[in-house]
Each structure stands twice: as C-alpha cells, then as structure tokens.
Design a protein with these regions (language model features):
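Intrinsically disordered, low-complexity serine/threonine-rich segments
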Residues: 5, 19, 35-37, 44, ...
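N-terminal secretory signal peptides that target proteins for export/translocation
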Residues: 1-20
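Gram-negative bacterial Sec-dependent N-terminal signal peptides
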Residues: 15-37
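Intrinsically disordered, low-complexity segments enriched in polar/charged small residues
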Residues: 9, 23, 28-29, 189, ...
Length: 560
C-alpha cells in the first residue's frame, strides 16, 4: 500500500496506457530498490470465536489433553480423577455450527459419550495404571500414554481402534519407559513417538529412586502398532561414555550425583513434516533432543540458551507482593533458562522450524533440599549487585525464585541469578537449532494489559509473578487460508495468544482468547491444544480445541 500511495503522489494522473505502464515500471523499480515485495502486506487476520464447550461440572481431572478424530467428528479427552482414574472420554462435535455461544462462561452445548476406563484394559498381575498422561490420534488409531503405579516403573501405551461413531475398541498395549508423559504420531502415521520423562520418585528423599528418561518409538504398519517399542535412552552421553563429548555444556544437568541419563527428562514431542525426525523437549534440562526416526537414534541435544532480563525487551514483573497495575522492569545480572514445555514444528518455504512454549520447571516437589531459593535468602556478590539490599526487598526481586545451584563465585556468593522459564515463546531453525525469534516480555504485557484489576490481583496471576509469570504451557501451529498461525496456551493467565508465524523471524500478534471472568469460572488453565484443519472440520472452517486443566472443560474455537 505504501508504494501505491507513493506512486500516486509522484506520478501524473493516468491518462493513457503508456503512462499506466510507466507508473507500473516506476513502482517495480522502487520496490526492487527498497526490498519490498508483494508478501509485505499480510491479508486480514482471521478471527476466532467460541462456538462449542463441554463442561461436566466435575472440574479438575477432565479434558487436560485433547485430540480430534475426523471420521466421527469427535474430540477425545483424558479423564483422570479420583472416582474415574486412568480413563478417556469422547465429546461429539457433530452438528456444531458457526454461531458464537451466547453465555460462554456457563455454556455446555457439546454432548459426551461414556467414559472409557483404560485401567480395565491394561491392568494385570504385572502392571497397575497410575494415570493417563496424554493421547493422540492418527486415522482411526487412538494412542493413550499410561503411567505405572508407582510412576517410576515402566509405563505403557494403550491402543484403541475408533469407528465412524467414535466407539473405541481396545487393540493392545505396548511397554515403554518410565512415566510416558507426551506422545505424538508422525504426520504419515507410520510411527508413534513417546517421551518417557523418568521423573524422580515422589519419595526420592528417602528411597533415592531416579529412573532414566527415554524416548520410545512404536512402528505402525497398515494401521496396526508393533508389539514392541524401540526405546532410546541417554546413557551414551553419561560421563566417560562413548558420546559424552557430544553433551553441550549448556544442557543443564541439575541434580548433583545424577547421571546424564537419569537427569534428562523428555517432556513433549513434535515431528517434522516429512516424518523423519522428532523434536523432544527436555524441560528441566533447558534443551531439545533431536531424534532420527528413519534409523532410530538420538542425533543431538540442542541447548535452548539463556535469556537476558537486563534488556528492556525482556523486562518482567518479579514480585507477588505488589498491587496491579504491574510494572515490568529489567534487572542486570538476571537471566532466564527457557526450559520449554510444549513444542510444535512447521515448515515455511522449505525450511523446518520448531516453536516452543517456554514455561520452566523444577524438581522441588521431589528433591530435598530443593533446587530453588528466593533471592532475599541469597548472599549476593557486591560487585555484581551493588544495590543488593534494594534488590532483595520483597517488592523487587526478594520473592523471586531462582536456581540455587547456578551463578555462584568461588566464595559461594551469587554473581548471576537464573530464573525458571522464559515467560515467552521462541522459534528455532530445526536444522541448525538457532533461535530465530523470541517474544521477549510481550506475553506478560499482553496478559497484564488484558486482565482487569480484580483478575490481576487473583492468586492465579499475582501469586505466580515470583515464579513463572503467565506460564506458557503449550503450543500448536495450523494453517488458515495461506497463513500459518501459532496458538500459545498460557496456563496461569487462563488464555491463548494467537500469532501469525508465516514469517518465522517476525511473528505478528493476532488475537487474545480468554473465557473466564474471575479466574474461578469459565475455562481455566489451558493445558492441551489441538488444531483441526478446515478440510476436516464439521463447520467447514478451521477449529482450535483447547483442554483446560483446572476447570476440566473443553473449548472449541472456530477460526475464520
């Protein structure tokens, strides 16, 4: 548009074909000289509106993870609550239309099928289900990640066949590693990749049990999964092992005394468009593992790097002892480990990228003493922090949780402080691992500017400023028209941020989705997201399915 206006201003009014051609040539010359191109002006962004919702009134324990089955036009959600553990449920999207919900916070216009107990199909003398962690669907094949009880024992994947009505028939179970936390079918449906977190025992302080993290690959041929998985662990990266020199120094090994294989904890899986590689987040380790699926092995470990909160673009709100409106500030010698949770891959102009939701996590629930401390309780190096007394006040950094094992000098004083998570999303070139974009403080700014004062003061938001802010939890990418959009779930803000990522180096914010008025009602804490392309949607337009961990609800947004 700029170039069109410029030509109108500097060229005479069009009176002939010759003048018209001259104007077009002049426009082309200017565009070439200044690097403009037709793609500089993005088409109008699509808008998402809430058209469907399922809430059974039970709250937590339902709908944490969601997947879509095209043939039956159904969503499948995990169910794991006290009276219905280790289960899943079908929610029908048949008959869904494009009308916005009239009372979105209270509405529940979707019908559900019976809850299916996975435990009843997999429990035997050698295995007791300890909960369902994730699910995914390829064609008519449903896969459920099931942790064992205790969680440190090897888990399994339960497979079901779905019919056109969404009825599920149990097929088989396949053993995998300890605590299968995330799983994903390859785009071609030929493999299922499972991230086995291998988390510390809940009673680690007394029993010392720390299983290895691992990645399982289950082949699928003609719609039937193999009886056995290929499971890869990280023992080759242990000290003195054959690949120990390949372990980047920037990959965080957090627990003193742990081997590399024990400390690396796979969390979430995404797979390249050509089904050749899996990208698996190692959240506690601030890294991503690249897995070759054609000749199964771990190719390399990619450290995600460090975020400098001394830069203005990375300012943050760091205290839960202040009242809104929150002021974002930058602090010298304060850094963040990205520690990605959710991950998604996408391709632009032949290049593969992955996008991560940089939530952060620690092991304090299991590891005693813990690995974090509040800044007010630390001895700060006077040269690095000449204003230490002021910084350690509760209304500044005093309440902020940081890693207590990083950034100390030889006297045990802290020269640098490292927080958990990036409070952001970032995009990486999948081939090189290089970060090509990072959202800085934008997610925090969006959250705090879009919530009113009463919501900002809620413990769900204010109470997390000293930890991980809005907590980017999950991310999916989908195509709407000719554009690619990322949907980033913010757990503590109970919101989803939509970005146009068609240009991976310069994403553009599009829309903020939130269906809660007081952080006590409506849809709370998005955990799992699933994108439904228009070609498979019951409305003919793309859909976003969102599972909410705290409210136990499922939301369906139409994007058009």
């Amino acid at each position: 548009m700029f170039w069109q206006v410029l030509i109108i201003l500097i060229a005479p009014a069009m009176k002939s074909t010759r003048q018209f051609l001259l104007r077009r040539l002049l426009a082309a010359a200017l565009m070439s000289a200044f690097g403009a191109h037709a793609g500089d002006s993005a088409p109008p962004a699509p808008q998402a509106q809430l058209i469907g919702r399922f809430a059974d009134g039970v709250s937590a324990g339902t709908a944490e993870i969601v997947a879509f089955h095209a043939a039956s036009r159904s969503a499948f959600i995990t169910v794991d609550r006290r009276n219905q553990p280790s289960s899943f449920q079908r929610v029908s999207l048949r008959g869904l239309n494009s009308s916005a919900l009239a009372n979105p916070v209270q509405a529940s216009n979707l019908t559900s099928g019976a809850i299916t107990s996975v435990a009843s199909h997999v429990n035997d003398a050698g295995f007791t289900a300890g909960g369902v962690q994730s699910l995914d669907i390829a064609g008519d094949l449903l896969a459920i990640a099931v942790q064992a009880s205790p969680k440190t024992d090897p888990g399994l994947v339960a497979f079901y066949r779905l019919d056109t009505q969404g009825n599920a028939s149990f097929l088989k179970k396949v053993n995998v590693g300890s605590l299968p936390d995330g799983l994903k079918f390859s785009p071609d449906g030929s493999q299922l990749v499972v991230a086995n977190e291998g988390e510390l025992s809940a009673t680690f302080a007394t029993d010392g049990i720390d299983p290895v993290g691992s990645i399982s690959i289950i082949a699928v041929k003609q719609g039937m999964p193999a009886d056995q998985a290929v499971t890869l662990d990280f023992s080759d990266f242990n000290a003195g092992a054959k690949r120990s020199i390949e372990l980047p120094a920037a990959v965080r090994i957090g627990r003193i005394g742990a081997s590399v294989a024990q400390d690396l904890e796979p969390e979430y899986v995404s797979i390249s468009a050509d089904s050749s590689r899996a990208y698996v987040t190692l959240q506690e380790n601030n890294a991503v593992a690249v897995v070759n699926l054609r000749q199964p092995h771990i190719e390399r470990l990619l450290p995600m790097g460090i975020k400098d909160h001394g830069l203005a673009r990375n300012a943050l709100a760091a205290s839960d002892q202040v009242e809104p409106p929150f002021q974002l500030k930058s602090y010298n010698q304060l850094f963040g480990l990205y520690m990605p949770d959710g991950i998604a891959t996408f391709r632009v102009n032949g290049s593969e990228y992955f996008i991560t939701a940089n939530e952060g996590d620690d092991r304090d629930d299991f590891q005693k003493p813990g690995e974090t401390a509040r800044v007010r309780n630390l001895a700060l190096d006077a040269a690095a922090f000449p204003d230490a007394a002021a910084l350690q006040a509760n209304h500044e950094l005093g309440r902020l949780n940081v890693f207590n094992t990083m950034g100390r000098n030889s006297q045990g004083q802290y020269e640098k402080l490292h927080i958990l998570g990036g409070r952001s999303f970032s995009i990486h070139n999948a081939r090189t691992g290089a970060q090509v974009y990072e959202s800085g403080s934008e997610l925090e700014r969006l959250a705090y500017s879009r919530l009113d004062a009463s919501l900002l003061g809620h413990a769900q938001v204010k109470g997390r400023l000293d930890n991980k802010g809005p907590e980017p939890e999950s991310v999916v990418v989908g195509q709407v028209g000719s554009r690619l959009y990322a949907f980033v779930g913010l757990e503590r803000a109970s919101a989803i941020a939509i970005y146009d990522v068609s240009k991976p180096t310069a994403p553009r914010f599009v829309q903020w989705l939130q269906n809660s008025t007081d952080l006590a009602n409506g849809d709370l804490s998005p955990e799992g997201l699933a994108f439904v392309p228009a070609a498979h949607s019951p409305t003919g337009n793309a859909l976003l399915l969102a599972g909410y961990e705290v409210s136990g609800s499922l939301a369906v947004y139409e994007i058009r």
